[in-house]
C-alpha cells in the first residue's frame, strides 16, 4: 500500500520528534498536564555534554524521552562521522551499527512515574531506532534497590552513571507522611543551624519540593566525576529560604555553569516558571569531605573568635534577671502573693513581649554579622 516504501530510519531526529509531539501533544498536555521540554533546550544541553558511545546516561524524569533521544542521536552522528561509508561498505557497517546500537541498548536509561507516559516514551524510542529497553515505569525518587527489586533491571544502581540529563517536575511537594523515603534524603531533613545554642535533634521536614529531592537522587546515581544537567526553577537559586539547598549543591558538586532560560522557554506548553539549567560535576567523596571539613573549621573559628556561645548565654542570663526583677516589682506594687501570679498580669506580659523582641533583634543582628563573616571567610 501507500506506506510500503516509507523508511523512517533515514528521517532526521527533529522531523520524527515533531511528528511524535504533534501526534501525542494533546495526550500529554490535556490528559496529564505533562510538558515536553522544548527541542531547542534539549539539543543545547546534550550538545554541550561530552557524551561518548560508552557513556552511561540516565534521565530520572524522562517524560517522552527527549533527552535520551538526543543523546542517542549524538552518538549515532559520531558513528556516522567515524564510518561515513557504512551504507555501501559492509566492513564500516559492522563497526557503525554496534557503535550506536550498543549504546542505545545498554547505556540509555530512563525513569518515568506515569505508566502511560512511560509507554509513550518507549514508543518514541522505537520510532527513533530503539533505546527503549531500559525505560521503566517507577517513582524516580525511590531507592536504587527498590527500583532493581521491582523491575529486575540491575542497571539502575547508584554511583554508576556518567551523565544525568533531566527536567524534573516543579512545584509538587513530597510529604513525609505520604512517602517513607523522605527520611532517607539529606535534603528531606531540616538543615543544621551552626549558630544554634543547643544541639538540635535530627528532624524530618514535613514536606519537600520534588525538584529539590531530585537533585539529591541524581547525585546518588552519578559516578564520581559524572555530570548532571538539570533544569530547575530560579527559586532554588535565588530564594533565601533555599540557601541550604545551594549549600548542599556546593558540597556535592563543582558548578560548571548556570544558564538562565528565558521566561518564555516553556510558554508554548502553557508553563511560565522562570528556570535555569545547572551543569554540575560530582565531586569525589574525599573532595566533598574536604569541603565540609573546611566549612566546619570556619564555623568553629568564628564561634570562638566572636565568643558567640558566651555572649548568647550572657544574654539569656540578662533576660532571666530582668524578668525576675520586673515580676518582683509588680508583685510588690499590686500585692500579689507569688512571682508566677505577677507574671500573669497584662502589664508583665506586655513588658515581657517588648523585652524578648529587643533581645531577638540583638540575636538576629549578631547572627547576620556572623553569617556575613562566614560567607567572606568561605570565599578566601
Annotated model-derived regions:
Residues 1-26:
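Long recognition/docking surfaces used for binding and targeting
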Residues 142-143, 149-152, 156-380:
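A conserved structural/catalytic subdomain of Rossmann-like adenosyl-cofactor enzymes
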Amino acid at each position: 500500500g501507500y506506506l510500503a516504501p516509507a523508511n523512517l530510519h533515514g528521517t532526521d531526529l527533529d522531523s520524527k520528534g515533531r511528528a511524535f509531539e504533534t501526534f501525542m501533544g494533546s495526550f500529554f498536555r490535556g490528559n496529564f498536564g505533562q510538558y515536553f521540554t522544548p527541542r531547542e533546550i534539549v539539543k543545547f544541553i546534550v550538545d554541550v555534554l561530552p557524551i561518548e558511545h560508552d557513556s552511561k546516561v540516565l534521565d530520572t524524569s524522562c517524560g517522552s524521552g527527549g533527552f535520551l533521544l538526543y543523546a542517542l542521536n549524538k552518538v549515532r552522528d559520531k558513528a556516522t562521522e567515524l564510518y561515513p561509508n557504512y551504507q555501501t561498505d559492509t566492513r564500516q557497517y559492522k563497526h557503525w551499527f554496534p557503535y550506536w546500537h550498543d549504546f542505545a541498548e545498554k547505556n540509555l536509561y530512563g525513569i518515568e512515574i506515569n505508566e502511560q507516559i512511560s509507554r509513550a516514551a518507549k514508543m518514541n524510542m522505537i520510532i527513533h531506532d530503539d533505546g527503549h529497553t531500559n525505560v521503566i515505569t517507577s517513582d524516580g525518587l525511590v531507592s536504587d534497590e527498590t527500583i532493581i527489586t521491582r523491575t529486575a533491571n540491575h542497571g539502575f544502581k547508584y554511583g554508576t552513571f556518567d551523565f544525568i540529563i533531566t527536567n524534573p517536575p516543579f512545584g509538587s511537594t513530597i510529604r513525609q507522611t505520604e512517602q517513607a523515603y523522605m527520611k532517607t534524603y539529606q535534603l528531606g531533613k531540616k538543615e543544621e543551624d551552626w549558630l544554634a545554642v543547643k544541639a538540635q535533634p535530627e528532624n524530618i521536614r514535613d514536606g519537600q519540593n520534588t525538584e529539590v529531592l531530585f537533585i539529591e537522587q541524581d547525585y546518588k546515581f552519578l559516578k564520581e566525576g559524572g555530570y548532571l544537567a538539570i533544569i530547575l526553577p530560579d527559586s532554588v537559586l535565588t530564594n533565601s529560604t533555599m540557601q541550604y539547598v545551594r549549600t548542599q549543591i556546593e558540597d556535592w558538586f563543582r558548578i560548571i555553569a548556570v544558564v538562565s532560560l528565558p521566561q518564555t522557554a516553556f510558554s508554548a506548553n502553557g508553563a511560565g516558571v522562570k528556570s535555569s539549567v545547572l551543569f554540575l560535576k560530582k565531586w569525589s567523596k574525599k573532595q566533598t569531605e574536604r569541603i565540609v571539613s573546611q566549612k566546619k573549621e570556619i564555623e568553629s573559628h568564628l564561634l570562638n573568635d566572636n565568643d558567640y556561645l558566651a555572649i548568647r548565654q550572657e544574654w539569656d542570663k540578662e533576660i532571666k534577671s530582668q524578668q525576675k526583677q520586673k515580676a518582683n516589682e509588680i508583685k510588690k506594687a499590686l500585692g500579689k502573693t507569688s512571682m508566677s501570679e505577677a507574671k500573669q498580669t497584662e502589664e508583665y506580659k506586655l513588658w515581657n513581649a517588648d523585652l524578648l523582641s529587643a533581645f531577638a533583634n540583638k540575636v538576629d543582628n549578631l547572627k547576620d554579622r556572623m553569617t556575613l563573616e562566614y560567607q567572606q571567610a568561605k570565599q578566601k
